[in-house]
Amino acid sequence: MTTPHINAVDGAFAETVLMPGDPLRAKYIAENFLKDAVQVTDVRNMLGFTGTYKGKRVSVMGSGMGIPSCSIYATELFREYGVQNIIRVGSCGAVSRDIKLRDVIIGMGASTDSKANRIRFKGHDFAAIASYELLEKAVNAARALGIKARVGNIFSADTFYTPEPEVFDTLEKYNILGVEMEAAGLYGVAAEEGKNALCILTVSDHIRTGEKTTSDERQSSFNEMLIIALDSIVAE
């Protein structure tokens, strides 16, 4: 069955889907990390692929930018294609002073300025948290790989060019590790659908210091994050 935004056939997606924002990043993951990967969807050029990693079937698909786009794809994957787990893999800007460029952050919870989860949760505040099983496996995978991963709260912003930069003072006070644009929505959709979600991020720039990574540095650290995610999928 196809949906308005996904034209894959039934059974095309694995139980677990990696979800970068950029569809070309999804293609990169499929070509460089998955074996025998095949493209399964391409509506609006939002590419999706399925292959295997260490013998286990895994899919990867882009989400686009922001909570609305990510929520559409996550809902359709969970509801129409039998996907059980979505792991977002992406970049973020750091606000905490002790977070460095290229650090890996695992989002235990996701605060947000979006009202999407309030709409979903009948006007109340919803605690948008990762699925514990996925979180535990990712932490263990990072430890086994010798990669230091920071675990904590992240912030999903509705605006990239914020008109209120003073918000970063508040985020730093509350020990928010990084800022991105999708996780809170993904966690809300997973809860609504009774499924599982996790967000693993690489720090691409530091909002407080103005530091930025080069494209080569982003690629290297992004690969570390991907291996954590993939190894967590095949963990028993």
From Swiss-Prot:
Gene: deoD
Keywords: Glycosyltransferase, Transferase
Keyword Transferase among record annotations: yes
Single GO MF annotation: purine-nucleoside phosphorylase activity
Family: Belongs to the PNP/UDP phosphorylase family.
Protein name: Purine nucleoside phosphorylase DeoD-type
Enzyme Commission numbers on file: 2.4.2.1
Sites where the protein binds phosphate: G21, R25, R44, R88, V89, G90, S91
UniProt organism field: Psychromonas ingrahamii (strain DSM 17664 / CCUG 51855 / 37)
PANTHER family, alphabetized: PURINE NUCLEOSIDE PHOSPHORYLASE DEOD-TYPE, URIDINE PHOSPHORYLASE
Functional note: Catalyzes the reversible phosphorolytic breakdown of the N-glycosidic bond in the beta-(deoxy)ribonucleoside molecules, with the formation of the corresponding free purine bases and pentose-1-phosphate.
Keyword Cytoplasm: no
Catalytic reaction list: a purine D-ribonucleoside + phosphate = a purine nucleobase + alpha-D-ribose 1-phosphate; a purine 2'-deoxy-D-ribonucleoside + phosphate = a purine nucleobase + 2-deoxy-alpha-D-ribose 1-phosphate
Gene Ontology CC entries for this record: cytosol
Classification via InterPro entries: DeoD-type, Nucleoside_phosphorylase_CS, Nucleoside_phosphorylase_d, Nucleoside_phosphorylase_sf
Subunit (UniProt): Homohexamer; trimer of homodimers.
CDD domains: PNP_EcPNPI-like
